Amino acid sequence: MEISTLTTILDTTLAVIFTWVAYKTGQIIWKYTPYSYPNARIRAMEARLLTDQRFSELAESKTLQNFVVSLEDTDYSPRLASLQSYNLYEIERALDLSLVDLVELMIKIMPKRIRGLFEILLEEWDVRNITNVIKAKLSNLPPQDFIIPAGRMFPKVKAMVESKTMEEILVILEGTEYEEPLRKLLLKEIDLQAFELELYKIYYSKLLKYASSRKGEEKLISEEFIKMLIDYRNISIILRAKLSGMPSEEIKSLLIPGGMLSRAVLESMLSSEDVMMALGELEGTRYGDALKDVREAVEGGRIDKVEEALRRYILNRMKELSQFYPLSVAVALTYLLERESEVRKLKAVAKLIEDKAKPEKIKELIGEMA
């Protein structure tokens, strides 16, 4: 073989190798670099999460004013600093708004290709606000006391608050995905509970549709996250409904499609004779180990202990994913769950302080929460 031929082959081979290396390098840069800044920022915020020692100190606050002052050096300070009075309603509202601020921050700093997930997560406030306005209107209560200035439809929510009739609200929601469920409610085709569930079905359907449109790790992580949230709601619905004696067919209509639990498991839970048997159907699932210590609590009607165990499982699973995929959306979703857990605990501390509970009792109850 002539030298010129060998040189040509060598040049071609090197060109192919360099092209492949450049392609792979480009893939890595596209895949991971956009997460470097947001995840570094989130890790810094994660370091500021409240420790058990800090919660013990908060339990000693004695008054809500002291409780708020004790949080001045935390990420809750911007919202708590604007309080007009130190009452439980205002404090809980400020804590909720701190979570809204967090999701809005994620929308700003996360890579464009996953930003839509957080935009849809923000829509849960649309569901909450719309549901709360309808509930308040039907109960002749002031709806403005039950809404949070958050969500993508807040201008419409404000218009709903000012409306005089339910028909006006239907006009306000015209053209949105929430119009039809409200129409069914007004026609008495569904009750208020079913109306709320219809809104949540729309919400989770949008989340799943978005997650399934992603690629690679982003699809894997976001789909598992959303499906676990759906399982959480479905398990809670089934167990609470079983406890209240609701017929299986009625429970089935309340379930949200798209979770990780198989249809067979859900059907077995639905056909179970009682709440304990329904819980037993989860033993062979991914949630089995997490729920093995709550049977006694469930026998006493404490479904909240199941919910705590499931929240703890979901958080731990997301932590695993964030460790396995350190430059991914798992880091942001894990931190969001951590902050939601922290807010639940802070609300509980505030409520117990208002109720004049002893610090020792507050510490005991908070230590059990998830």
Curated annotation (Swiss-Prot):
One of its GO terms (cellular component) is plasma membrane. GO terms for molecular function: ATP binding; proton-transporting ATP synthase activity, rotational mechanism; proton-transporting ATPase activity, rotational mechanism. One of its GO terms (biological process) is proton motive force-driven plasma membrane ATP synthesis. It comes from the Archaea. It is found in: Cell membrane. Keywords: ATP synthesis, Cell membrane, Hydrogen ion transport, Ion transport, Membrane, Transport. It is a peripheral membrane protein. Transmembrane segments: none annotated. Has multiple subunits with at least A(3), B(3), C, D, E, F, H, I and proteolipid K(x). Component of the A-type ATP synthase that produces ATP from ADP in the presence of a proton gradient across the membrane. Belongs to the V-ATPase V0D/AC39 subunit family. This is A-type ATP synthase subunit C. It comes from Pyrococcus horikoshii (strain ATCC 700860 / DSM 12428 / JCM 9974 / NBRC 100139 / OT-3). The gene is atpC.
